[in-house]
Amino acid sequence: MGLVEAFGHVSARLPEGGFMITATRPLPGARAAEVLQLSDEGEIISGEAELLPLETPLHVAIYAARPDVGALCRTHSPHAVAWGARSAVPPLVIGLDGLSGEIALHDDTDLVVEIAAGAAAASSMGDADCLLIRANGNICSGGLLSEAVVRAWFLEQRAANASRIGDAAPLEGEQLARRSRHYDVELVRAWRWCRAQFGDRDQL
């Protein structure tokens, strides 16, 4: 999908508590057997400790602060990174890019490797759907893993389109309210497209 290179991780909350998180392997070659199972506090239940992402505390803190969040995608997609480096939210200039959801900013440039730093990032995120971390990528949330993936994809599209188009008037207020009433349906369709492009066509 072009959202991660060597770095990036994905997690999903478990119904019985805790969550699963991908290992520190390049995601295109990730194997199910390498996914780690963690407690709500980030303690390893199953999986290899050396494969645990450094920024696991970021996931722990957001899940603790946001019971509505069921999955997180941590990426370093290039256009979103550029907007984060400017400490600026890319304006919404293309209606479909609103599938990114609400975007917040976090000004700390360090890796989120301690729970206090994770709590600070979660506080910056508030009720937003995505968080741009200054000079350090982004993290996107969803009630389901499919929603988090779609938001990560459209965050990058939104950032790229805002950079390309420049000074176009953004969608906001009544225009955005009218356009956004279709987002729930479009998100489902966008997930099917992602699966067709990058996943298993037999499971669409």
Walk through the language-model features, giving the residues of each.
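Short acidic/polar capping segments at secondary-structure boundaries
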Residues: 26-27, 77-80, 109-112, 127, ...
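Structural motif
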Residues: 18-20, 70-73, 80, 102-104, ...
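Conserved active-site and cofactor/substrate-binding residues in soluble primary-metabolism enzymes
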Residues: 5-7, 30, 53, 57, ...
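Divalent metal-coordination and catalytic microenvironments
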Residues: 12, 62, 76, 121, ...
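A conserved C-terminal secondary-structure "cap"
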Residues: 127-204
